[in-house]
């Protein structure tokens, strides 16, 4: 059984739609590669170190507020950092962001945190500004598929 954890702070309809795309894409990817998937979704404010410790892969999503990740996702990282620091090395992950402007600060902050955790990024972060395009939908589907495959050890 492959466990995929999806952690997000979904304060807007577009972000909720992105999470829905991840959930459907993860199930489809698992079926396509013949993997039994235990998919767990958690709000960033309630996700825990135990959730991460039990996961084989993780995808997280955040709004970009004033050029930075949401406080909720930062809170999640603060809660899991020390318990997971030496226990989750090489955990495959991917992430997506939604905002109406530049996400460079959010990307830099997230990359710094997951770099310190020594997790393994399996695809470039997806940055969605304004609406979700068919291209953005496909890129998120592809990212999710890569995380599922990596979580399954493929």
Spans of model-derived segments:
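Glycine/serine-rich loop-strand microenvironments at binding/catalytic pocket rims
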Residues: 1-8, 44-58, 141-144, 148-153
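N-terminal beta1-alpha1 ligand-phosphate binding loop
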Residues: 2-30
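Short histidine/acidic/glycine/proline-rich micro-motifs that form metal-
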Residues: 12-13, 97-102, 128-133
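Residues at alpha-helix caps and immediate loop-helix transition turns in enzyme cores, especially N-
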Residues: 18-19, 72, 106, 136-139
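Short helix-loop-beta junction
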Residues: 21-35, 115-120
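Glycine-rich phosphate/pyrophosphate-binding loop and the adjoining helix
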Residues: 31-34, 48, 120-154
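Generic structural signal for residues in well-ordered beta-strands
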Residues: 37-41
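Helix-loop-strand module that forms the ligand-binding subsite of alpha/beta enzymes
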Residues: 44-121
């Amino acid at each position: 059984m492959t466990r995929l954890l999806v952690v997000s702070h979904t304060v807007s309809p577009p972000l909720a739609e992105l999470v829905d795309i991840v959930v459907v894409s993860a199930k489809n990817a698992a079926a396509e590669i013949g993997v039994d998937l235990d998919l767990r979704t958690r709000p960033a404010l309630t996700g825990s170190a135990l959730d991460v410790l039990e996961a084989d892969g993780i995808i997280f999503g955040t709004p970009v507020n004033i050029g930075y990740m949401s406080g909720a996702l930062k809170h999640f990282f603060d809660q899991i950092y020390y318990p997971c620091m030496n226990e989750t090395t090489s955990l495959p992950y991917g992430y997506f962001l939604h905002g109406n402007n530049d996400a460079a600060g959010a990307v830099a902050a997230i990359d710094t945190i997951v770099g310190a955790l020594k997790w393994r990024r399996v695809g470039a972060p997806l940055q969605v500004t304004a609406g979700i395009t068919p291209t953005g939908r496909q890129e998120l589907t592809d990212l999710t598929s890569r995380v599922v495959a990596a979580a399954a050890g493929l």
